[in-house]
């Protein structure tokens, strides 16, 4: 959880964010130990700010973690580990996800 991976998101349909891009792993390690899938949130440098998008600076570029585009992917889509987000960014991301999925 909190690692940034380069991930191949293609093929996609409609408004799903596409191409190979950095993504943040948001699922916990306990899931990774038993499943062949991980839950990720794509990153972008071109999107618009919103309450469900967390600002991030990675590799000298400002961007957003797109929590509105989370998805489960097979580990075969993982291309390369690029680093990790800060604890502050991870905490903000998990807070938004919790607010999204709890009544």
Stretch-by-stretch model annotation:
Residues 1-103:
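Conserved functional hotspots at enzyme active or ligand-binding sites that engage polyanionic ligands
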